From Swiss-Prot:
Keyword Transmembrane helix among UniProt keywords: no
GO CC terms in record: cytosolic small ribosomal subunit
Protein name listed in UniProt: Small ribosomal subunit protein uS15
Database matches in SMART domains: Ribosomal_S15
Pfam families per the UniProt record, alphabetical: Ribosomal_S15
Length: 89
């Protein structure tokens, strides 16, 4: 279900804006996207895991708010992130 620490560090290294960046919106959205994808695969096999489904919905909401913030502050960074992650927007 959850992504491993090594995978999370790889994602942070790929999407960070500077050397010590771990909290920029790009990094947060990328980590949330990886967690959402992992949880989606879990929920495909465990259809009645409603507790995890609620966690998934909370993650999607958190990602939506971060994307909205990024879109309002810097549209260029928002578009680049959407393209890199392959999100539908």
């Amino acid at each position: 279900m959850a992504i491993t620490k090594e995978r999370k560090n790889e994602i942070i290294a790929e999407y960070r804006t500077h050397e010590s960046d771990t909290g920029s919106p790009e990094v947060q959205v990328a980590v949330l996207t990886a967690e959402i994808n992992a949880l989606n695969t879990h929920l495909r096999t465990h259809k009645k895991d409603f507790h995890s489904e609620r966690g998934l919905l909370k993650m999607v909401g958190r990602r939506r708010h971060l994307l909205k913030y990024l879109r309002e502050t810097d549209v260029q960074r928002y578009r680049e992130l959407i393209n890199r992650l392959g999100l539908r927007r």
